[in-house]
């Protein structure tokens, strides 16, 4: 079996795009096209023709513009509202520079010598499905896969400036700027923000630690109780540091970088100390690993210990939750203890884009949910106790750890210290972000709703009350 590199050299992965042609056209540089787009007003009507002409840009082959989301690439119905002109130009000219989450490529090699390249569409215990540039679904049985890896090159071909003229390119950008569907949706809710006004008083953001303290992609911080000086900082790559604000010193507590799977939405994402710390010296982590090709979320308990050689460290790992995902996307982020001393876990739908398996509405899976467990007790065959007042504790088929459902990517969760409310920031699909207050047993809508707007009825349950967000806003606002 040849490694991927050998197959690529042989030219099998032709779906990636013709980088040679791009390199052979120095007179049509990216800089020139960028300059033209910045200084010239194009014709959006002609640009629509370029978009749809498969012998020209051919964008229609992979992208829908009507919200149908039928292609292998993102739906572009709102792209003009989401991106400014500079970002549009960069995305078209250099598609691999910043690939949208959920649209990265996956390369699979089989024991028969076949190589497949596409966007992950579906993953099960028996097979993997990829969607190709022709929006064709390719199914590969798991027992035939000998190698699987994430690609770094977009399925959208490089070198569009070698296939269309400069005038056509400017027209294409003008057409993309007109695609502003989300701005026109009739959303009537006090919680929908069409714009964010400037604050009456400016707010200054200042570094929390001294400038000499540097971190590599810090994603979470946990203060030591009754201690205004020391904090634990977690880095996405798998390291945890004990940091002193006063002395600007940092001490390595944990390094699981060899175990953690680091990517756009994966890595060491959450850390929290036991509510009775340091009397109870347990620390809890949430991170992702690659387990035989499946992205798997781990919620783990460790002990705050001492090492005569290295000082303090997090030791004695004990796995609490192991949640197998479908793709690398939407694994949630935070874990937090509530005022009831229960551990709450935000878990995303795990993809692929648009939640085609309906994880958010499926009570038999932990994906797309807020979970609640008691880590101070144990049930039979479980390393934790399921609280008796969890809303689905008596449900015949539901996972009893579920506290609330209908989430896409609950990246951050936090409890209000005054009201005790659970606030959740949920990342949207193509159009809207949302912030919600989440209570016991509530259904927050994904993928039936995205924010306040309808998204899909495919997995709409019967006779279900959906709880809208407190605030929702278009992605163009940040």
Which sequence ranges carry the predicted segments?
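Acidic, Gly/Ser/Thr-rich repeat motifs that build Ca2+-stabilized beta-propeller blades
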Residues: 185-354, 412-415, 420-428, 478
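C-type cytochrome heme c attachment motif
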Residues: 49-65, 74-94, 104-107, 114-129, ...
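Electrostatic cytochrome c docking/interface patches
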Residues: 25-54, 72-74, 84-87, 111-114, ...
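Post-cleavage N-terminal segment of exported redox proteins
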Residues: 2-44, 53-54, 65-68, 82, ...
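Structured surface patches comprising rigid loops and adjacent beta-strands/short helices at the edges
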Residues: 135-155, 213
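Intrinsically disordered, low-complexity linker and terminal regions at domain boundaries
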Residues: 147-171
């Amino acid at each position: 079996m040849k490694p991927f590199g050998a197959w690529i050299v042989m030219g099998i992965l032709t779906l990636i795009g013709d980088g040679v042609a791009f390199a052979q056209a120095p007179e049509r540089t990216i800089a020139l096209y960028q300059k033209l787009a910045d200084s010239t007003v194009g014709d959006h009507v002609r640009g629509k023709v370029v978009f749809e002409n498969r012998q020209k840009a051919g964008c229609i082959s992979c992208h829908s513009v009507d919200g149908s989301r039928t292609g292998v690439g993102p739906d572009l119905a709102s792209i003009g509202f989401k991106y400014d002109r500079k970002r549009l130009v960069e995305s078209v000219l250099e598609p691999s520079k910043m690939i949208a989450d959920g649209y990265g490529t996956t390369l699979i090699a089989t024991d028969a010598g076949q190589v497949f390249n596409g966007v992950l569409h579906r993953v099960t215990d028996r097979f993997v499905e990829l969607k190709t540039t022709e929006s064709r679904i390719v199914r590969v049985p798991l027992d035939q896969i000998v190698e699987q890896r994430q690609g770094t090159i977009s399925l959208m071909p490089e070198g569009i400036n070698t296939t269309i003229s400069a005038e056509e390119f400017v027209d294409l950008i003008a057409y993309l700027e007109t695609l502003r569907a989300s701005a026109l949706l009739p959303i009537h809710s006090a919680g929908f923000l069409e714009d964010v006004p400037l604050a009456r008083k400016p707010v200054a953001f200042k570094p929390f630690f001294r400038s000499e303290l540097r971190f590599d992609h810090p994603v979470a911080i946990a203060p030591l109780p009754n201690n205004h000086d020391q904090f634990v900082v977690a880095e996405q790559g798998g390291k945890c540091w004990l940091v002193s604000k006063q002395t600007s010193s940092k001490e390595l507590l944990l390094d699981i970088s060899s175990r953690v799977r680091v990517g756009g939405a994966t890595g060491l994402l959450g850390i929290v100390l036991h509510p009775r710390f340091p009397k109870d010296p347990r620390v809890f982590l949430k991170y992702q690993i690659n387990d035989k090709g499946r992205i798997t979320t781990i919620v783990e308990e460790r002990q705050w210990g001492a090492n005569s050689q290295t000082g303090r460290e997090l030791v004695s790992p004990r796995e609490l939750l192991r949640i197998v995902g479908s793709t690398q996307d939407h694994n949630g982020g935070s874990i937090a203890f509530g005022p009831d001393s229960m551990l709450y876990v935000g878990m995303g739908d795990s993809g692929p884009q648009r939640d085609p398996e309906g994880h958010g509405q499926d009570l038999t899976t932990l994906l797309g949910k807020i979970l609640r467990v008691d880590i101070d007790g144990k049930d039979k065959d479980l390393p934790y106790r399921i609280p008796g007042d969890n809303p689905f504790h008596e449900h015949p088929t539901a996972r009893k750890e579920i506290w609330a459902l209908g989430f896409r990517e609950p990246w951050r969760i936090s409890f209000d210290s005054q009201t005790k409310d659970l606030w959740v920031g949920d990342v949207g699909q193509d159009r809207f972000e949302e912030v919600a207050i989440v209570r016991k047993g509530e259904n927050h809508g994904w993928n039936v709703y995205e924010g306040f707007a309808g998204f899909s009825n495919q997995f709409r349950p019967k006779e279900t009350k959906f709880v809208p967000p407190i605030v929702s806003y278009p992605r163009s606002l940040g």
